[in-house]
Curated annotation (Swiss-Prot):
Catalyzes the interconversion of 2-phosphoglycerate and 3-phosphoglycerate. The keyword Magnesium does not apply. The gene is gpmA. It comes from Proteus mirabilis (strain HI4320). GO terms for biological process: gluconeogenesis; glycolytic process. PANTHER family: PHOSPHOGLYCERATE MUTASE (PTHR11931). Substrate binds at residues 10-17, 23-24, 62, 89-92, 100, 116-117, 185-186. It catalyses: (2R)-2-phosphoglycerate = (2R)-3-phosphoglycerate. Belongs to the phosphoglycerate mutase family. BPG-dependent PGAM subfamily. This is 2,3-bisphosphoglycerate-dependent phosphoglycerate mutase. Pathway: Carbohydrate degradation; glycolysis; pyruvate from D-glyceraldehyde 3-phosphate: step 3/5. The active site is at H11 (tele-phosphohistidine intermediate), E89 (proton donor/acceptor). InterPro entries: His_Pase_superF_clade-1, His_PPase_superfam, PG/BPGM_mutase_AS, Phosphogly_mut1. Keywords: Gluconeogenesis, Glycolysis, Isomerase. SUPFAM superfamilies: Phosphoglycerate mutase-like.
Length: 250
């Protein structure tokens, strides 16, 4: 049976991850730790014999720079890369820039967990005159008003990620190309939920660690037959638990 592989990678730790802030579409840089994480991911992929034919990422530099660091390590800097806003992080609305623990102290752990992990729950909206509104950013100039979010739930994130998967990425993977996607915690959760047909309850508890390669194997019908992380299982579990704890009051 022919097996096709796909690699998903959440970006390395960003400056706002380090500060425990809601980031969303805010374009923040990787921290020093995040750059190191991305480099280690690339080294791990190289050691495991992975090479790629094509790459996808978002239009946010923490994901783009994660991909660059990985491609440096596997010595494929020349690889064709397609960037799309449809792979952006979920838009966190008026929460963007706020500290997660302080927000939990104000609104309670359960409310923040629902904002972060609830399937159809949207954070408070931005207003269009807010400087954080994506309509003010030139990289989104081609988007229609309906496409510019004021906030997003995971369900709404799925609504933009899955058509991009079906129409753009999946045909390339199905053709036999070896593809890597460098994106974000929630855009990747959206894709994992779709690929694995997860329930809303299951996706609530899924936390994707930073810069750990997640490998999918597909059969000839593009049905997922295996999903696994590369790396030390205990370290990966600890990183995933740290992601889960970000939204709790101290």
């Amino acid at each position: 049976m022919a097996v096709t592989k796909l690699v998903l990678v959440r970006h390395g730790e960003s400056v706002w991850n380090k500060e425990n802030r809601f980031t969303g579409w805010t374009d923040v840089e990787l921290s020093d730790k995040g750059r190191n994480e991305a480099q280690e991911a690339g080294k791990l992929l190289k050691a495991e014999g992975f090479t790629f034919d094509y790459a996808y990422t978002s239009v946010l530099k923490r994901a783009i720079h994660t991909l660059w660091n990985i491609l440096d390590e596997v010595d494929q800097q020349w690889l064709p890369v397609e960037k799309s806003w449809k792979l952006n992080e979920r838009h966190y609305g008026a929460l963007q820039g706020l500290n997660k623990a302080e927000t939990a102290e104000k609104y309670g752990d359960e409310q923040v967990k629902q904002w972060r992990r609830g399937f159809a729950v949207t954070p408070p909206e931005l207003t269009k005159d807010d400087d954080r509104f994506p309509g003010k950013d030139p990289r989104y100039a081609s988007l229609t008003e309906a496409e510019l979010p004021l906030t997003e739930s995971l369900a709404l994130t799925i609504d933009r990620v899955t058509p991009y998967w079906e129409e753009v990425i999946k045909p390339r993977v199905a053709s036999g190309d070896k593809v890597i996607i460098a994106a974000h915690g929630n855009s990747l959760r959206a894709l994992v939920k779709y690929l694995d047909n997860m329930s809303e309850e299951e996706i609530l508890e899924l936390n994707i660690p930073t810069a750990v390669p997640l490998v999918y194997e597909f059969d000839e019908n593009m049905k997922p037959i295996k999903r696994y992380y590369l790396g030390n299982a205990e370290e990966i579990a600890a990183k995933a638990a740290a992601v889960a704890n970000q939204g709790k009051a101290k």
